[in-house]
């Protein structure tokens, strides 16, 4: 069974970061080793929260503890998401290096959460620069949304063709796979949720209907998306099939959340359709 060291945020109430991704990844049949960068009462879109950012040394201490019992060699991938400080980022990259020394075949999947003030997502100063300058070249896979794609590349993206070109420019700087998690205004259709999966040689586009939650969208969709893609790839799924499963599984979670009249992602209620989605979507090679 594959093992993923998942270094992300944690909320006690609701679903974001590890709280959104950990259970679905386990439900898909992998072991998850959750290591929390922050522990908050709830996610920041509520406008009020309590909790703390973990000291950067805490991350190193935990990883070293796993090394001390000689189990880092069993880690197949490191997944990182929301980080509380650029110092944490440096310690995460040190952990990635330590894992890869123990298991040279291990992957580093970076979800570069850079903040979106309009959505209530706030990151510390220096975090965006860390992702651009340090995490990007160290990653095997990276999963920006459109805003983060523009920040990583320093380029404005207006359409799908430009998004593919810019994603390929990121591949030239380190990662082998780039998932553009939400094309937003650069997509083909305003009423669809569209994603791209890009390598140096191939690109796939996929779309699904938007799920209407009114003014406030659920948090943690990107965390769920990244986690499920990593699981699919670790299990050996081809890139296009992995993209298709992720799109359908996340859509099922969104539908269940809407059906239940909730705002927090209903990953437990939707667990069966995470594994075996009812809806199907087709990835199109560009």
Curated annotation (Swiss-Prot):
Residues annotated as transmembrane: none
Functional summary from the UniProt entry: Pyridoxal kinase involved in the salvage pathway of pyridoxal 5'-phosphate (PLP). Catalyzes the phosphorylation of pyridoxal to PLP.
Entry's Gene Ontology cellular component terms: cytosol
Catalytic activity: pyridoxal + ATP = pyridoxal 5'-phosphate + ADP + H(+)
Protein family per UniProt: Belongs to the pyridoxine kinase family. PdxY subfamily.
Molecular function per GO: ATP binding; magnesium ion binding; pyridoxal kinase activity
Entries under CDD domains matching the protein: pyridoxal_pyridoxamine_kinase (cd01173)
Record carries keyword Magnesium: yes
Species this chain originates from: Yersinia pseudotuberculosis serotype I (strain IP32953)
InterPro entries: PM/HMP-P_kinase-1 (IPR013749), PyrdxlKinase (IPR004625), Pyridoxal_kinase_PdxY (IPR023685), Ribokinase-like (IPR029056)
EC number(s) stated in the UniProt entry for this protein: 2.7.1.35
Known cofactor(s): Mg(2+)
Residues annotated as binding substrate: 9, 44-45, 223
Protein name as catalogued: Pyridoxal kinase PdxY
